């Protein structure tokens, strides 16, 4: 496991050296603006802390996504645009088409390509193991590309994966929380959605890396396989840790905290000591046994490894035998 972590660290360091970028360049970044008149908006698709998202149309009538950014530091806007530019051409990743500014409100809007979407929870009982393999494979290909660029998504979850069951099309969207990775750098832990947060975030480990995305995607896979979204549903961060303890055993959480010198309250430790853990096979029931195959459970167990440095990289996950059934079809 130490060798795997060392390889990952070297690879990520090489990526950063090749990119030769500095975070403080964000304030200097400027982007050529397109013509806002070239686009129109119709219905609102969603709203978030940092943006409102609309269905839009381009001049030729084709659909697009219009993401209107709320007023935030210019560095955050610049970073999101820079990341989307670096991701341009990447597989199964939402593509930046244009950047425009409203003349009256001065708001910046990102124009992104359109992707059809059906909530994954509405497809549970129709998904085959091949459907799930294709879904996971495409998201991992997107992450492999992003990580090769030194970019962490930091908010992988079903809501940020556009999926069409008719065509098995997949688009990883919403790179607003994404960040460039620099080995040894401390990052804020208030990223990702609680039910998909890795233990490193919940225990305030700030020097996390791209393996966070692997955990988040593992949570997504667990929800799909066992038809329970979200799979880890804690009421707060401490309860989220306890939900993990119920599955993995409390001692694994405690050992992880001790290894990285992370703080666990006495109350939390006392409760975790009562959890012996469960096997993934114990979640296999009549309704899900056709998709929760031994290969799927093995991939899941590797992605949902408590120690962030022992999780597979996206490339390693893509080489898992689970994908042999679709490897020549994607």
Predicted region positions:
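Glycine-rich ATP phosphate-binding loop
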Residues: 52-70
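Conserved HxN/HPN-centered segment at the entrance to the catalytic loop
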Residues: 89-99
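Conserved short submotifs of the Hanks-type protein kinase catalytic core
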Residues: 105-118
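Activation segment signature within eukaryotic-like protein kinase domains
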Residues: 135-136
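Catalytic-loop of the protein kinase fold
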Residues: 147-163
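C-terminal lobe substrate-recognition/regulatory segment of protein kinase catalytic domains
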Residues: 250-301
């Amino acid at each position: 496991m130490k060798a795997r972590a060392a390889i990952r660290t070297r690879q990520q360091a090489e990526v950063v050296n090749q990119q030769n970028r500095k975070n403080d360049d964000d304030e200097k970044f400027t982007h050529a603006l397109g013509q806002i008149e070239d686009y129109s908006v119709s219905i609102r698709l969603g709203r978030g802390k940092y943006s409102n998202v609309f269905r839009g149309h381009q001049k030729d009538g084709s659909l697009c996504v219009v993401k209107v950014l709320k007023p935030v530091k210019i560095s955050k806007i610049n970073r999101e645009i820079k990341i989307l530019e670096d991701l341009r051409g990447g597989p199964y990743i939402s593509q930046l088409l244009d950047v425009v500014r409203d003349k009256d409100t001065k708001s910046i809007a990102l124009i992104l390509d359109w992707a059809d979407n059906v909530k994954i929870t509405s497809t549970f009982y129709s998904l085959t193991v091949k459907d799930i393999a294709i879904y996971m494979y495409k998201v991992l290909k997107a992450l492999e590309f992003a990580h090769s660029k030194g970019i962490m998504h930091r908010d992988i979850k079903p809501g940020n994966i556009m999926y069409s069951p008719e065509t098995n099309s997949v688009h990883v969207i919403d790179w607003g929380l994404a960040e460039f990775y620099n080995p040894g750098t401390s990052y804020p832990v208030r990223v990702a959605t609680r039910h998909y947060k890795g233990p490193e975030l919940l225990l305030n480990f700030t020097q996390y890396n791209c393996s966070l995305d692997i955990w988040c995607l593992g949570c997504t896979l667990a929800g799909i396989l066992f038809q329970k979204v979200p799979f880890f549903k804690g009421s707060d961060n401490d309860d989220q840790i306890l939900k993990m303890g119920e599955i993995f055993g409390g001692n694994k959480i405690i050992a992880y905290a001790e290894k990285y010198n992370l703080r666990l309250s006495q109350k939390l430790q006392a409760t975790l000591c009562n959890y012996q853990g469960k096997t993934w096979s114990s979640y296999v029931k009549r309704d899900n046994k056709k998709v929760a195959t031994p290969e799927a459970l093995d991939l899941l167990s590797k992605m949902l490894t408590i120690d962030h440095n022992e999780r597979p990289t996206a490339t390693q996950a893509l080489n898992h035998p689970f994908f042999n059934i679709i490897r020549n079809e994607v």
